[in-house]
A protein has these predicted regions:
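Phosphate- and other anionic-substrate recognition elements at nucleic-acid/protein interfaces
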Residues: 1-139
Length: 139
């Protein structure tokens, strides 16, 4: 859980997704830096990063779980919260424009079929990639 992070690039001029994937957090950070470097050099478009921030969520759906299941779920939540903190610090230091987004305001956990129908994205995706794409889709 939490090994890979969803990553997507939305082109607001073309109104289309350019990339949807899942990759380790350090690789996602390298891609953000690369896109931002291109923008600063005058060869790329403006970059706005949106990060899902579970620190803004107040419930985690553990009410009907056993103690063991709840413990595992909350460990995963802790790891995702830590990732959000890391992103927050990294993006602030990088100087790129960004927004931390509360999970409830984002459409997540779409099936591959539903995602294709909604976005028109035809390539293979996983849940992480689709969740990342829904953070930027239509933005």
């Amino acid at each position: 859980f939490g090994v890979n992070t969803g990553f997507a690039v939305w082109d607001s001029k073309q109104r289309s997704l350019l990339q949807v994937c899942s990759l380790p957090i350090h690789k996602a950070m390298e891609r953000v830096r690369s896109l931002y470097d291109e923008y600063k050099a005058g060869i790329g478009d403006k970059v706005i990063v949106r990060v899902e921030d579970p620190r803004q969520r107040t419930w985690f759906g553990t009410e009907r779980m056993s103690r063991e299941m709840e413990r595992k779920k909350l460990q995963g939540v802790g790891s995702v919260k830590r990732d959000a903190s890391i992103w927050d610090d990294y993006l602030k230091e990088l100087g790129v424009e960004y927004e931390m987004v509360a999970p409830k305001r984002n459409v997540t956990k779409l099936t591959q079929e539903r995602f294709k129908a909604l976005t028109g994205w035809q390539k293979q995706t996983n849940e992480h990639g689709r969740d990342g794409a829904m953070l930027v889709y239509g933005f």
